[in-house]
């Protein structure tokens, strides 16, 4: 149990470091077991409206960065996620939008299956 708690705390610290340092620090992580994910996303500059967000999960993310950013790619590797595309917008520390308000970055993402930690294939969302 302590090991699981230790991993959770380490992962939370890594996410905080990625969000605080978009350029990354050049550290490479490798995770055990991989999951290949195919993400089809709109162009990162395309803004969608709430009615155009067909995934059903509109998120408010603390940060949205490109999957090729060093810190983001390290986090994906640590989680065992291998994206089949490059330059996929990744939302970090994302929560569901409640009451139509978001104080950070409102996005519509194609893959929200990783809890509140990350969302994949994110496009800016106009509230």
Swiss-Prot record:
Q: Which cysteines are joined by disulfide bonds?
A: 53-108, 60-102, 61-94, 109-122
What tissue specificity is annotated for this entry? Answer: Expressed everywhere in the mycelial tissues of developing fruiting bodies except for the top parts of the pileus (cap) and for the prehymenophore; but high level of the transcript is detected in the parts surrounding the prehymenophore.
Q: Does the keyword Secreted apply?
A: yes
- GO molecular function, one example? structural constituent of cell wall
> What InterPro entries does its record include?
Hydrophobin (IPR001338)
Subcellular location field: Secreted; Secreted, Cell wall
Glyco sites are at 66
Entry superkingdom:
Eukaryota
Q: Which UniProt keywords apply?
A: Cell wall, Disulfide bond, Glycoprotein, Secreted, Signal
What do the Gene Ontology cellular component annotations say?
extracellular region; fungal-type cell wall
Q: Where is the signal peptide?
A: 1-20
User: What CDD domains does the entry give?
Assistant: hydrophobin_I
Function of this protein? Aerial growth, conidiation, and dispersal of filamentous fungi in the environment rely upon a capability of their secreting small amphipathic proteins called hydrophobins (HPBs) with low sequence identity. Class I can self-assemble into an outermost layer of rodlet bundles on aerial cell surfaces, conferring cellular hydrophobicity that supports fungal growth, development and dispersal; whereas Class II form highly ordered films at water-air interfaces through intermolecular interactions but contribute nothing to the rodlet structure.
Quaternary arrangement and interactors, per the entry? Self-assembles to form functional amyloid fibrils called rodlets. Self-assembly into fibrillar rodlets occurs spontaneously at hydrophobic:hydrophilic interfaces and the rodlets further associate laterally to form amphipathic monolayers.
Query: Which family, according to UniProt?
Result: Belongs to the fungal hydrophobin family.
Q: What is this protein called?
A: Class I hydrophobin 1
